[in-house]
């Protein structure tokens, strides 16, 4: 029998599908990545083609192994991590989606959310799912598909349709339709899963008019769900043994498995998660209570705050404003000036996430004077990422009663030393950047590897989490508070835009 030397993480993100191959020492041996189409049918709507998601993801798996000359029988397990909340509904007989995947960023169900609030469901949903009633989560997206796609409601009632977040869709496709599962972390993002009983909530399903028969079976984040065949007939069968939503996978990859440990992922959006262990902490500050992975992939509780526009605001500087030609240039231009010259950018392009939850706020630049140049705007845009992170972290510390000793960071923007230092200064907290910043993939790989005995346990993995650099805060308190007050004022301006609009109508 061939020695199994590798674990593969499939990282299905918002803009690209990736495959990351790790060896036993948790070193990255090979990476393959493919972007796929972003579909914007109308303002505020975002979709993906589920078939393209599967095609790009399966081809990166083959590519990553091929690049490194790794045979499929050398792979011990596959772990999956995915963009969360994004919703796929498909016909189980034909295997075809009835509609495009509705992406987490999509705001089309805002009116459905308003209607559910009017029906008095808000507090029940909050208490039992840990989430706020917002278009972000899967529940209203499924309802929209059933209500708006011709024939979907009838097929659903007849038991022909299945729902899945992206992990569920990939596993179903990879096992030729044999396995319809998700894990606790992804289930907890649907707004349909009761985090007290750890079951699908039949009251919410009934209120949304979604048949229980559509829902996947919910399992731990680290166990063998099924096997996939690589290399066609007579190929190798490899266990799919780990699933976690991208943010929970990153939390696990950062080894935040104990209560009070927290991380921030700077991706398209920013996502802060704090593990609260077996204690369900209810937020009074606009955060979500959600499920994360305990030490062995069993469900644990966490607090989460989502910032919708993190790296996406740097892309906006590049693609729409054309102030930079490469996202990496943002640090260079931001450091050409000493301050943002009184400018604040509030990148509320799709509303504001935690702790504000204002779907109607819009992007705003305030404090413009004649002396402001493009470098100030670039700097203020980077600073907005750090300010939004502080908004969330302040709320987390208030809810949990835990003062954070250090923040672990990951994601594309952590390569930006200016942003990391400014983040430490704004928070007055050390920021730790790990050597391996692919922590989302690491988390999925760890969960899969542990399930099949590729690694013995957490102690072995914790020895692999090395820090590349610690950023220590070095600002005086008066300056910190003054700047942050200015940010809070700027946010009020972004929120006032919609309020004033409503008053005029």
UniProtKB/Swiss-Prot annotation:
GO molecular function, a single term: glycerol kinase activity
Xref: Pfam families: FGGY_C (PF02782), FGGY_N (PF00370)
This enzyme's EC code(s): 2.7.1.30
Residues bound to ATP: 14-16, 268, 311, 315, 412
NAD as UniProt keyword: no
Chain positions recorded as glycerol binding sites: 84-85, 136, 246-247
An annotated GO cellular component: cytosol
Binding annotation for ADP: 14, 18, 268, 311, 412, 416
Domain of life of the source: Bacteria
Keywords recorded for this protein, A-Z: ATP-binding, Glycerol metabolism, Kinase, Nucleotide-binding, Transferase
Residues that hold sn-glycerol 3-phosphate according to the record: 14, 84-85, 136, 246
Catalytic activity entry: glycerol + ATP = sn-glycerol 3-phosphate + ADP + H(+)
Keyword DNA damage: no
Any one GO BP annotation for this protein: glycerol catabolic process
Pathway: Polyol metabolism; glycerol degradation via glycerol kinase pathway; sn-glycerol 3-phosphate from glycerol: step 1/1
Activity modulation: Inhibited by fructose 1,6-bisphosphate (FBP).
Family membership noted in the UniProt record: Belongs to the FGGY kinase family.
Functional summary from the UniProt entry: Key enzyme in the regulation of glycerol uptake and metabolism. Catalyzes the phosphorylation of glycerol to yield sn-glycerol 3-phosphate.
Protein name in UniProt: Glycerol kinase
Organism the protein comes from: Vibrio cholerae serotype O1 (strain ATCC 39315 / El Tor Inaba N16961)
Name of the coding gene: glpK
């Amino acid at each position: 029998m061939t020695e199994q030397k590798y674990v593969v993480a499939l990282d299905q993100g918002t803009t690209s599908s990736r495959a990351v191959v790790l060896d036993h020492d948790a070193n990255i041996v090979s990476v393959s990545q493919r972007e796929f189409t972003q579909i914007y049918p109308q303002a505020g709507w975002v979709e993906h083609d589920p078939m393209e998601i599967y095609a790009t993801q399966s081809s990166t798996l083959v590519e990553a192994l091929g690049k490194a000359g790794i045979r499929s029988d050398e792979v011990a397990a596959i772990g999956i991590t995915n963009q969360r909340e994004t919703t796929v509904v498909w016909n189980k007989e034909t295997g075809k989606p009835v509609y495009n995947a509705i992406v987490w960023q999509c705001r089309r169900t805002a009116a459905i959310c308003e209607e559910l609030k009017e029906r008095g469901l808000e507090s029940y949903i909050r208490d039992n799912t840990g989430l706020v009633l917002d278009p972000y989560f899967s529940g209203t997206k499924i309802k929209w598909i059933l209500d708006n796609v011709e024939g979907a409601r009838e097929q659903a009632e007849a038991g022909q349709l299945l729902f899945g977040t992206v992990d569920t869709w990939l596993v179903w496709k990879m096992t030729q339709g044999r396995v319809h599962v998700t894990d606790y972390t992804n289930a907890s993002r649907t707004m349909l899963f009761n985090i007290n009983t750890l079951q699908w909530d039949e009251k919410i399903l009934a209120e949304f008019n979604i048949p229980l028969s559509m829902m996947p079976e919910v399992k731990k984040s680290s166990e063998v769900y099924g096997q996939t065949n690589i290399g066609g007939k007579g190929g190798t069968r490899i266990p799919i043994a780990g699933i976690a939503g991208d943010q929970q996978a990153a939390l696990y990859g950062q080894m935040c498995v104990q209560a009070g440990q927290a991380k921030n992922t700077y991706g398209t959006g920013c996502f802060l998660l704090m593990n609260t262990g077996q204690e369900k902490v209810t937020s009074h500050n606009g955060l979500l209570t959600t499920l994360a992975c305990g030490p062995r992939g069993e469900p644990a509780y966490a607090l989460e705050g989502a910032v919708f526009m993190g790296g996406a605001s740097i892309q906006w500087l590049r693609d729409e404003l054309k102030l930079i030609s490469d996202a990496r240039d943002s640090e260079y231009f931001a450091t050409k000036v000493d301050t943002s010259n009184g400018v604040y950018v509030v990148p509320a392009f799709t509303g504001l996430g935690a702790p504000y939850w204002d779907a109607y706020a819009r992007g705003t630049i305030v404090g413009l004077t004649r002396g402001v140049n493009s470098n100030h705007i670039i700097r203020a845009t980077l600073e907005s990422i750090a300010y939004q992170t502080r908004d969330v972290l302040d709320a987390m510390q208030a809810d949990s009663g835990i003062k954070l000793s250090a923040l672990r960071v990951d994601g594309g923007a952590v390569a930006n030393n200016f942003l990391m230092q400014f983040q430490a200064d704004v928070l007055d907290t050390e920021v730790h950047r790990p050597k391996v910043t692919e922590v989302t993939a690491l988390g999925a790989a760890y969960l899969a590897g542990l399930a099949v005995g590729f690694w013995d346990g957490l102690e072995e993995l914790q020895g692999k989490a090395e820090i590349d650099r610690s950023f220590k805060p070095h600002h005086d308190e008066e300056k910190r508070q003054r700047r942050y007050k200015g940010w809070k004022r700027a946010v009020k301006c972004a929120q006032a835009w919609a309020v004033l609009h409503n008053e005029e109508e």
